[in-house]
Curated annotation (Swiss-Prot):
<dbReference type="GO" id="GO:0075509">
    <property type="term" value="P:endocytosis involved in viral entry into host cell"/>
</dbReference>
<protein>
    <recommendedName>
        <fullName>Hemagglutinin</fullName>
    </recommendedName>
</protein>
<feature type="disulfide bond" description="Interchain (between HA1 and HA2 chains)">
    <location>
        <begin position="12"/>
        <end position="492"/>
    </location>
</feature>
<comment type="subunit">
    <text>Homotrimer of disulfide-linked HA1-HA2.</text>
</comment>
<feature type="glycosylation site" description="N-linked (GlcNAc...) asparagine; by host">
    <location>
        <position position="174"/>
    </location>
</feature>
<feature type="glycosylation site" description="N-linked (GlcNAc...) asparagine; by host">
    <location>
        <position position="153"/>
    </location>
</feature>
<keyword id="KW-0261">Viral envelope protein</keyword>
<feature type="transmembrane region" description="Helical">
    <location>
        <begin position="547"/>
        <end position="567"/>
    </location>
</feature>
<feature type="lipid moiety-binding region" description="S-palmitoyl cysteine; by host">
    <location>
        <position position="577"/>
    </location>
</feature>
<feature type="glycosylation site" description="N-linked (GlcNAc...) asparagine; by host">
    <location>
        <position position="33"/>
    </location>
</feature>
<keyword id="KW-1164">Virus endocytosis by host</keyword>
<comment type="similarity">
    <text>Belongs to the influenza viruses hemagglutinin family.</text>
</comment>
<keyword id="KW-0564">Palmitate</keyword>
<feature type="glycosylation site" description="N-linked (GlcNAc...) asparagine; by host">
    <location>
        <position position="526"/>
    </location>
</feature>
<dbReference type="InterPro" id="IPR008980">
    <property type="entry name" value="Capsid_hemagglutn"/>
</dbReference>
<feature type="disulfide bond">
    <location>
        <begin position="102"/>
        <end position="151"/>
    </location>
</feature>
<keyword id="KW-1133">Transmembrane helix</keyword>
Amino acid sequence: LMVVTSNADRICTGITSSNSPHVVKTATQGEVNVTGVIPLTTTPTKSHFANLKGTKTRGKLCPKCLNCTDLDVAFGRPKCMGTIPSAKASILHEVKPVTSGCFPIMHDRTKIRQLPNLLRGYENIRLSTHNVINAETAPGGPYIVGTSGSCPNVTNGNGFFATMAWAVPKNNNNKTATNPLTVEVPFICTEGEDQITVWGFHSDNEIQMVKLYGDSKPQKFTSSANGVTTHYVSQIGGFPKQAEDGGLPQSGRIVVDYMVQKSGKTGTITYQRGILLPQKVWCASGRSKVIKGSLPLIGEADCLHEKYGGLNKSKPYYTGEHAKAIGNCPIWVKTPLKLANGTKYRPPAKLLKERGFFGAIAGFLEGGWEGMIAGWHGYTSHGAHGVAVAADLKSTQEAINKITKNLNSLSELEVKNLQRLSGAMDELHNEILELDEKVDNLRADTISSQIELAVLLSNEGIINSEDEHLLALERKLKKMLGPSAVDIGNGCFETKHKCNQTCLDRIAAGTFNAGEFSLPTFDSLNITAASLNDDGLDNHTILLYYSTAASSLAVTLMIAIFIVYMVSRDNVSCSICL
């Protein structure tokens, strides 16, 4: 009895399928459905401003100076003297700083409103302990240092700003018109610091000008430092009486300006009557990032954004309104971005069938395989046991590593773009510290376009790498199966043994041993020999009987065939008689 058996199963490499496809954009394929995505963008909502995490954040210049504007602090108003804490970040909460108390100031004649913003741009700010000029003995003197009841000191006596000395001629002998006089302003700060020198001039109606200075004509003033020269001419009269912060009404006005002296550099001031000579100066160093915002600062945040307030960074990019931001901030992009985090979407696989020798089923994979929950790439087998699926964790991890690398590359691109294209935003200008919005928007558009292209290329690479992963799986599978299977193409192999779920799991884990699953091969014949009973006959006798019977049968058959042949040719006749 001979029994022929076939034990062929089919094993194929495959990719997972999903019932929830997502869409990503690629550079050349347009929109592609994938099994998973990593959202790269968020749209923030407006919140209160906060302290920047990991840094000291400055709100008011002098938090302990009560009832004082930042301009009061910058001028050194007597009741607004205090320490300005160091800070790496500052909130420009007075977009247009309000007027200072004390004496009425003509803010619009100079850039003095920018002084608080300039000071915010420094990390460390201190007021000098010594005066930069001896006002009493300055050219054109001797002078007395004027004070005003409109600017009371801490004891409520008459006072004036700590940064300026109101130089009033001491006696009638020098209360006369004078030609322009020049005083040198030395650098008294520490090396490496910037020196911010505040100065100004006073003007009033003709009567007061003659009374104070002996000259009723407009006076000329010039300041020069670091190659920047500024000219002013005073305005005589025409001012209505005005009181500041509850002070006494004043018919006169003061004009205040400042100059920035770099380390070791001197400045000059040329003046006539009514000069407000510089006294204590601001010594500043380091850089503090400045952003427009509002007070109070509540809690902490990763990022401070002019439009959204305090933000905690959850994604590398954001959509919505673009504006200046400081800290660990997401980068603005025009449209939402997603990075492929899986494989190209394939509908569940169909097994196409065709009849083969002995009714064997041949099929191949079309689409993706369901059930591969532990990974993206893996193996399938189908045969009498049905369909088994197993994920290859190593291949999946390699794919995940590539996506992680792409994500890290995008993060590096984010940092490089910030440093290269937005670096100028960190170096605040020495004066107004304002940005040209058109240039800033153009910079943001450029960064957004670069990031979007990088994401498209990353998605393209992730999707195209699937072929590499499948080819690697096919090589791995072929090596493990060895001679126990035949390569039939398309990543499929026909085995000479059964391969159920256990077999497939071992293949996926890399522990497969063909010997454990192999059965006799298809080309082996199973022959069952007939058993002979022993009747006391020896082998020779049995062989003799067998040979005689076989020979007699053969001779009889030959004679019968010969007779039939002769009769058919009429060479032999046969008569039957009864």
